[in-house]
Amino acid sequence: MVDVNRFKSMQITLASPSKVRSWSYGEVKKPETINYRTLKPEREGLFDEVIFGPTKDWECACGKYKRIRYKGIVCDRCGVEVTRAKVRRERMGHIELKAPVSHIWYFKGIPSRMGLTLDMSPRALEEVIYFAAYVVIDPKDTPLEPKSLLTEREYREKIQEYGHGSFIAKMGAEAIQDLLKRVDLVTEIAELKEELKTATGQKRIKAVRRLDVLDAFNKSGNKPEWMILNILPVIPPDLRPMVQLDGGRFAASDLNDLYRRVINRNNRLARLLELNAPGIIVQNEKRMLQEAVDALIDNGRRGRPITGPGSRPLKSLSHMLKGKQGRFRQNLLGKRVDFSGRSVIAVGPTLKMYQCGVPREMAIELFKPFVMREIVAREFAGNVKAAKRMVERGDERIWDILEEVIKEHPVLLNRAPTLHRLGIQAFEPVLIDGKALRLHPLVCEAYNADFDGDQMAIHVPLSEEAQAEARLLMLAAEHILNPKDGKPVVTPSQDMVLGNYYLTMEDAGREGEGMIFKDKDEAVMAYRNGYVHLHSRVGIAVDSMPSKPWKDSQRHKIMVTTVGKILFNDIMPEDLPYLQEPNNANLTEGTPDKYFLEPGQNIQEVIDSLPINVPFKKKNLGNIIAETFKRFRTTETSAFLDRLKDLGYYHSTLAGLTVGIADIPVIDNKAEIIEAAHHRVEEINKAFRRGLMTDDDRYVAVTTTWREAKEALEKRLIETQDPKNPIVMMMDSGARGNISNFSQLAGMRGLMAAPNGRIMELPILSNFREGLSVLEMFFSTHGARKGMTDTALKTADSGYLTRRLVDVAQDVIIREDDCGTDRGLLIRAITDGKEVTETLEERLQGRYTRKSVKHPETGEVLIGADQLITEDMARKIVDAGVEEVTIRSVFTCATRHGVCRHCYGINLATGDAVEVGEAVGTIAAQSIGEPGTQLTMRTFHTGGVASNTDITQGLPRIQEIFEARNPKGEAVITEVKGTVIEIEEDASTRTKKVYVQGKTGMGEYVVPFTARMKVEVGDEVNRGAALTEGSIQPKHLLEVRDTLSVETYLLAEVQKVYRSQGVEIGDKHVEVMVRQMLRKVRVMDPGDTDLLPGTLMDIADFTDANKEIVISGGIPATSRPVLMGITKASLETNSFLSAASFQETTRVLTDAAIRGKKDHLLGLKENVIIGKIIPAGTGMVRYRNIEPQAINEVEVIEEAEATEEPAIIKE
């Protein structure tokens, strides 16, 4: 076998007949498979041991030679070589075809490669190949045209007319083979290149296509006649197995049936030829042979598929590769693994951040080999077999061994669907009773897991390297930040939030208010004994907490706080300020001075002068976690998170919040508000009946009235709510529910959507406390049902989007430190009309500058060129009033097959500069795809008001952008730079004309009457500026402006969609994806290069080709950039393995074979397919051969004692 990690590239070409013979170990002559009595393979049949190798290891067919010592001997009785049975997976056979047969991929694919090579239509080819017409191969001296078709009758007439042997015409694949042999590639290519200089239109397109195929044959060394098969390879028998079922029946792969048909027809044809049968019979047999081979290669591609029992189409070779169940996606890109298990998950509130609970029964099965080894090492058993028996019997001693084996051995937990890299994390196992896996509550958000019956899979990393990677890179405690936006992903939720909210509440006049304590312990003791309430404001000596960062003026004083806040601050990292107010100032700058008093001052007066603070909500906890991470990194943060979780659970239990129907308040003036709304609606309807408004206007007015009524109720609800009400506490803290849920419980449910998506005018006036009437209940069911179906559809759509995104960007890896480009991207805040979608500060964080940034007023340099912009620096730049900054960007990076560290900036998941080897493409794809399920599905219908078209939003809009489709509601853009001089309306055609006067000429643009204008007379417009509202078509923009403008536009558009749904995604992720869509150029004029006009190629390859020509003094080629949708971009990638495993497998492979494509295995996917370590992270070539140095431990200890320095183990 080939050593997987030894080869650099993989090439695919057409197989010549001699190549097929060299692979083969013998000819399969009979259609038999195995003998029904002896169940042994038949001689010369499809499973023959002589050809394919023995069925049992080291044993020939007749049994003369058994055992390994006869290795390599060929038995003299039965002719079978004594070797491993495994060779039956590798050895091929062949069938000598008695008539040439065309390969359906090359004849039937689109475009037909055979047709282009011969310049014949696929229709004509089909008539010849399937014996419906003759083709003239050599007209000799007759006036016939070469390659022209003759029917049976015409052929006979011509023979009579010109005499026998006066010209050559044949039918069948044989004729095509003769024609293909006559193709002179070099002259044809030269002729086509000449023709291209003058050709236009359809003719030019056809010439370019032909030239492409002929050039591929010429360069690859494939011969066109190899598209016709004279000899058919037979794949190894173990790849098309035949197995006996209970009851003596056999189940065989469909391929065996298909091969049998070919052999039967081939043998029959041989017999007919021997007998000199009449031409028509032979012809018919040849056609049937052709059809049999077609079915074997791609059943159902031409005509009706051959069916097996129960009229089920048989699975041919092509079907084995295609689709989700094909070889690529089912067995090469994803495999089932051993040492894995799955079970239901339950919550493990007592676990540490890096732990998970694994049931004992599960662990013993997963760690069986490790336990067995240890049993033998401790001599509890003599050999492995005995040890295995011990484990299976459940001997008492195995449990202690198991405890030791799993120490420090991380396991991976995965929850499907794995939408981003946080869907698989590593934990240290803790043995538990029961049968459910225990999961730490804080990692639920990353997994999107809950405990209502979710299941998770567990995997054991076996090798030392795998364990080290799991521990260092995948441990759950390391994954504090979300890779998509750099915000903490492990924020507490539900009970944890509620407990900390309750803990930090303040209340006036509770028992013990104004007491002063010397330290924390005294305060807690007083609280435990009931002298002081958790929410009472009390004093505490500042000096009892010496490690906190107090200001000098605050030391030796007494601070006003609550017992709850003393407990809350006790779990905080030491260097964090004492948190008194839930705001960022307190968190970053320190505790405000107003809470401190001198000893001896009247504390009650100070307390009365202070306002009551609001408690800490979910958002505040998130900010505290982010600040902690920023200051102390992962280890301290994960320890702090565990303390926060424990405190939250403990106090939410103590608080004992319950919910009853009486907790839902009654709004005192609900009846009045609704009465007023009814009155207003009546007036509107009256106005409509009098003809003062249109139906559309009436509809909008009515729905607005009800919306306002609902908002009035909501407002009243917020004004009158009691902060101690349990429901209010849950909602306010962010533990569960929001204002909309609350207003449905206590206010009114409001307007509902009808099945057609239009909002119904009749609102639901009741709330859930009063109860709904039957009609109201019926109205609300539609919305509920739509919600469910939408979610189901959205999940599939979003998953498919993620798959396409991953595919197009999987080979983008950080490949070098600095690409040294001199280009940059000028960025400013992204705005949508007046609203800011993304601020400049957010966009600057974690990027490198391209030029130095100066203060706009003083002119001082705030930050130099090529420096990393930190969070604080970004704030400083924005505060100085800078509006635009030139930064290093993925768009302008010059690295081939990837990005450099400086153009990328920081890795959002760690907060540090990105490392070489990081697979940023995959992370970008996951970051954009994972929130896809949160986007809405609907395209908004505005009820035919105030807008010319329905704007696409949510997921459909994201797909529209990434697939580079023409958008719905397209905006008209200007192609000239200048001034809008006039907008004239033409009532007859219902259009408006916009005239733009530029320096070189005048632009005239026709826009629909209903379109909303973005420009007025006198406005200055740039090329590519939108004249009307709507989405710009990116391909059109690319023609008018440059690549960078299109990239910037697409980036802004994607961000608008996500931000409008409240989803934050780092710019750099979108940049990576958009750059992949624009990485190709189309050659316009080849100049002196040997490029072909009209070919698509990578920008880097195009630049290289031009460099060579310019050096040698020739004319360089010209090209124009091409914008491709992500699906097209994936299929156009340089790696045929990656493209074939994505979509259109047969088309990709056909093309790759003709071109003799080489796959240099640069991306991740190609390497997964052939089983190499992926070239990212620790798998990069630079880390390939690192060997951990073994060190004699004794020496280290002695040296350490001698020098009294800690021992350092060398890498």
Swiss-Prot record:
Mg(2+) binds at D450, D452, D454. It is an enzyme of class 2 (transferase). It catalyses: RNA(n) + a ribonucleoside 5'-triphosphate = RNA(n+1) + diphosphate. GO terms for molecular function: DNA binding; DNA-directed RNA polymerase activity; magnesium ion binding; zinc ion binding. One of its GO terms (cellular component) is DNA-directed RNA polymerase complex. Zn(2+) 1 binds at C60, C62, C75, C78. It comes from the Bacteria. Its cofactor is Mg(2+); Zn(2+). Binds 1 Mg(2+) ion per subunit. GO terms for biological process: DNA-templated transcription. Keywords: DNA-directed RNA polymerase, Magnesium, Metal-binding, Nucleotidyltransferase, Transcription, Transferase, Zinc. Its EC number is 2.7.7.6. Zn(2+) 2 binds at C819, C893, C900, C903. Belongs to the RNA polymerase beta' chain family. NCBIfam families: rpoC_TIGR. The RNAP catalytic core consists of 2 alpha, 1 beta, 1 beta' and 1 omega subunit. When a sigma factor is associated with the core the holoenzyme is formed, which can initiate transcription. DNA-dependent RNA polymerase catalyzes the transcription of DNA into RNA using the four ribonucleoside triphosphates as substrates. PANTHER family: DNA-DIRECTED RNA POLYMERASE, DNA-DIRECTED RNA POLYMERASE SUBUNIT BETA. This is DNA-directed RNA polymerase subunit beta'. It comes from Streptococcus equi subsp. zooepidemicus (strain H70). The gene is rpoC.
